[in-house]
Structures are given as structure tokens and as C-alpha cells.
């Protein structure tokens, strides 16, 4: 899958839960955690903690473990052990659960990381971790020396051991389901019963994986995204070595293409879907969103419904730009997250230098098909993935493609007209409250143990 952002292995999708009834209030955005390296997946665990995957910032390339990026003018993607899994505990502590996990990112910016991508818990409380690759999977074990990338694992939190359940990257190498170029980058996954449904944005596929150790059971490719070539816009890239802030970046770049909607361009493009996000719909089907291919045409991304048994794919919505998250609220309304509202190349130079507006949007699609922008810009930037909190707000990985400045944010959609950004809380007690509430809602028999004090903490957000 050429020239597309495989490293948007973005976030865990919806954690099912009932909204806690509260009086309507202005929509607000709160920063719950900051200073992260390419944050992606979030999930509430059975212990009441909020778990967060950090894809990491890759390596410095000194050991030669680098490959050319298929999505960033072939700038080097270098491997390192900078990925991690962290959690915020019910008493407010930030802890590292797993560290020194393999990571792959642009060098030297650390942008567009691939590594620990998504996290989920099954109904029994077992943890599962998905890792991305962001490149040709045949280089994973040899050049990069990162055999753990491109796989779905079961995690033993007691021993910190990982048990491989599926090698998505190897499957792409051996099968290349969509018949296009050989690329794998598992983005996100959803669990239904004893089955995991894995979205691979590089391979353009959805895979059905048994959590019982039975492996990959079925793989289906998403339909090609056809766009009128005359409507495509292309960037004018500087020659190799002239990327601002990246003068010492090794490796080449393609010749600068022309600009404008009808310009002749030298970038190879393929019409592909690039799926990024998945969640369970109220009717028991799966809902999947796509990012789109380079040059990331605006207002072209689609949303699909997928039958969990047959993996039959049907388009249910379109007209979006670079989607990286989907979720449903308790009333059955669908929410879609736009990573950046304009084609990403207009706002971020190849190599990871932000030069423009990387604002994204959270869009509500009502059951009747009507659309409403719940939040746009104003702190929502290059975001990915949506986790529904028990009170009906959304947990999102913000600046999810950037090193050092990644965040976990909460958007409360109660009254979208106000669009109010609130300061970062002095503590993570609100986040802890979400975690505790999620745990109780997972185990309905314990709901009566939720205290008024905990609910008050949620209100303070």
C-alpha cells in the first residue's frame, strides 16, 4: 500500500458501557495525560485502571535497523525499543506496565510511530495487545529485527509475558489478500466473544482471529476507494535533504511533483481504502472507518458495516476526511473522528514537521443520518481512536502521531454548541473515576458499590 500512513495504528475503539445520566452541560475538552510518544490505544481494565499504549519514537538509526517509509517520501523508519504500555491506577498513580517494546518511527522526528497500537480486554478480564509494522513485512525479522511487530498477543500481567495469537504481517507476506503492494500495519481491533477482529491499514483487510489459539480464521479486503484523478491534489515536496528541521535525515526523496488538482505528479499512488478504526454497532455488526490513500483526498473517506460471521462488507456512509475513530453512544448514534480536517500533506511536512493546522473533528451521525460536528479544532489535533466512557463522554488519543507532545483527552459532547475547552486538571482523579466506573459497568453485580464521592469526581471534569 504505497504512500499512505500505515503508522496511524490508531487507538482502541469503543469500550461498551452505559452512559451515566447527568444534566446537560457545555461540550468540553480536558487533557488527562500529556508528554506521550505517539499514544494510540486506550481501554479500561478490570482493575479500574485506564490502560494506554504508547507506540514509541522508534530508534536513532545508529544500528542500521531502518527501512524507507512508504508513506513519508521514503524517509527512514528506524527501529528501537521505545514502545510501552502504561496505566493510570484508581488511586491516581501513573505506572509503566510494559516497557522496552519494539517501535518503528521516522528518524529523527520520532513521528508516525508503529509499535504497541491497540489494547482490549475480553469479558473475562484477559488483556490483548496489537502491534503495528508500517512497512514491508518481509523486512520485519531481518533488517528491522523486530519479530514482535505486526502481531496480536495475549498479555499475562502477572508474568509480563506475551503469547502470540496471530501474525498479521506474516499473513500479508504469504497471501497479500488485496493483491496490491506488500505492506502490513495492524491498526486496531475489536473483541466479540472469543473472536478478535483486526483491522490492518497496510494490507487493507479485516481479519477474524480466534482468541482460543486457533489463529487467523478468515481475512477479507476492503473495497478500493475510487476517486476521480482530476480531483486529486498533490504536494510540492522539497528535494531530498531540504526538509526543514531534517537536514541530516539520511535517505532520498522522490522528485518534487507538480501542484494543483490537475497537475502531473511523480508520486506512485494506488486506489486503496486504508481502514483504521473498528467498533461494535448496536445491532451486533461491526463498524469500520477508513483513512484513504495518498494524497488523502478530502471528503472521500467511507464508513462500512461488516458482518462478524461472513465478513461481508457494506458501505453505510461517506464524505469524510481521514477517519481514525468510530464509536456509538448509548442511544445508538454513531461518532466518527477525523484525524486532520484537510489532506495531511498540507499541514505536516514529510519528516514530521508541523507547518499548518492539524485540527481534527468529532462528528455525530444520528440514527436518521443527520450529521453534527460535536467538536472541531480548539485542542483536538491529529487525534485517533475513540473510547466511550461510562458517563457518555469520549476518551481520545490526541496528537497521536507525534513524539513528546502526545495526549489523552476527554471530550464531553453534552452541548456541542458551546465548544468549550477547559484547562488540564491538576490531578488525574477524573480519569481515575472513569476507570473505576468502567470496571463497575463491566461487572454489573458491583454497580451498587459506586459511591457518591466517585460520581462527584466525574462531575468535576
Enumerate the language-model features and the residues they cover:
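Beta-propeller fold detector
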Residues: 30-31, 95-101, 162-170, 217-231, ...
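Beta-rich, blade/repeat-based domains predominating
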Residues: 35-46, 81-82, 103-126, 149, ...
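Short, conserved, GDST-rich strand-edge loop motifs in beta-rich repeat architectures
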Residues: 53-82, 129-150, 230-251, 266, ...
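A short loop-to-beta-strand structural motif that recurs across blades of beta-propeller domains
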Residues: 81-86, 150-153, 205-207, 302-304, ...
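Short loop/turn segments that connect beta-strands within beta-propeller blades
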Residues: 89-93, 156-160, 210-214, 307-311, ...
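Blade-level signature of beta-propeller repeat domains, shared across WD40, Kelch, NHL, RCC1
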Residues: 381-419
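A short, hydrophobic C-terminal helix/tail in secreted or cell-surface proteins
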Residues: 421-441
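C-terminal membrane-anchoring or membrane-association module
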Residues: 437-461
Amino acid at each position: 500500500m504505497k504512500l499512505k500512513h500505515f503508522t496511524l495504528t490508531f487507538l482502541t475503539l469503543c469500550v461498551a458501557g452505559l452512559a451515566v445520566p447527568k444534566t446537560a452541560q457545555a461540550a468540553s475538552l480536558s487533557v488527562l495525560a500529556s508528554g506521550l510518544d505517539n499514544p494510540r490505544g486506550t481501554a479500561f481494565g478490570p482493575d479500574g485502571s485506564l490502560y494506554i499504549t504508547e507506540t514509541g519514537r522508534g530508534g536513532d538509526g545508529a544500528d542500521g535497523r531502518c527501512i524507507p517509509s512508504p508513506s513519508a517520501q521514503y524517509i527512514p523508519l528506524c527501529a528501537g525499543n521505545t514502545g510501552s504500555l502504561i496505566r493510570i491506577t484508581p488511586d491516581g498513580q501513573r505506572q509503566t506496565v510494559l516497557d522496552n517494546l519494539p517501535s518503528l518511527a521516522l528518524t529523527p522526528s520520532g513521528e508516525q510511530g508503529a509499535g504497541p497500537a491497540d489494547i482490549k480486554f475480553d469479558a473475562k478480564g484477559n488483556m490483548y495487545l496489537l502491534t503495528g509494522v508500517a512497512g514491508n513485512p518481509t523486512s520485519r525479522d531481518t533488517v528491522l529485527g523486530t519479530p514482535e511487530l505486526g502481531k496480536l498477543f495475549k498479555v499475562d500481567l502477572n508474568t509480563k509475558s506475551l503469547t502470540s495469537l496471530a501474525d498479521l504481517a506474516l499473513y500479508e507476506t504469504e497471501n497479500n489478500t488485496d493483491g496490491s503492494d506488500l505492506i502490513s500495519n495492524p491498526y486496531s481491533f475489536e473483541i466479540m466473544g472469543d473472536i478478535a477482529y483486526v483491522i490492518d491499514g497496510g494490507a487493507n483487510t479485516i481479519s477474524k482471529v480466534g482468541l482460543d489459539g486457533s489463529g487467523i480464521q478468515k481475512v477479507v479486503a476492503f473495497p478500493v476507494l475510487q476517486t476521480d484523478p482530476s480531483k486529486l491534489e498533490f504536494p510540492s515536496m522539497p528535494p531530498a535533504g531540504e526538509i526543514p528541521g531534517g537536514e541530516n535525515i539520511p535517505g532520498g526523496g522522490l522528485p518534487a511533483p507538480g501542484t494543483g488538482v490537475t497537475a502531473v505528479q511523480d508520486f506512485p499512488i494506488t486506489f486503496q481504502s486504508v481502514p483504521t478504526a473498528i467498533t461494535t454497532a448496536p445491532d451486533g455488526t461491526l463498524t469500520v472507518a477508513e483513512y484513504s490513500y495518498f494524497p488523502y483526498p478530502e471528503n472521500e473517506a467511507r464508513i462500512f458495516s461488516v458482518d462478524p460471521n461472513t465478513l461481508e462488507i457494506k458501505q453505510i456512509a461517506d464524505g469524510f476526511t481521514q477517519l481514525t475513530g468510530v464509536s456509538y453512544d448509548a442511544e445508538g448514534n454513531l461518532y466518527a473522528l477525523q484525524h486532520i480536517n484537510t489532506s495531511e500533506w498540507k499541514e505536516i511536512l514529510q519528516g514530521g514537521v508541523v507547518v499548518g493546522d492539524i485540527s481534527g473533528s468529532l462528528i455525530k451521525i444520528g440514527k436518521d443520518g443527520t450529521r453534527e460536528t460535536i467538536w472541531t479544532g480548539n485542542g483536538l489535533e491529529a487525534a485517533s481512536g475513540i473510547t466511550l466512557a461510562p458517563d457518555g463522554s469520549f476518551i481520545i488519543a490526541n496528537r497521536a502521531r507525534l513524539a513528546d507532545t502526545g495526549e489523552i483527552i476527554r471530550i464531553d459532547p453534552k452541548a456541542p454548541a458551546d465548544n468549550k475547552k477547559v484547562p488540564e486538571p491538576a490531578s488525574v482523579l477524573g480519569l481515575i473515576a472513569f476507570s473505576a466506573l468502567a470496571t463497575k459497568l463491566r461487572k454489573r453485580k458491583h454497580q451498587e458499590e459506586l459511591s457518591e464521592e466517585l460520581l462527584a469526581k466525574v462531575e468535576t471534569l
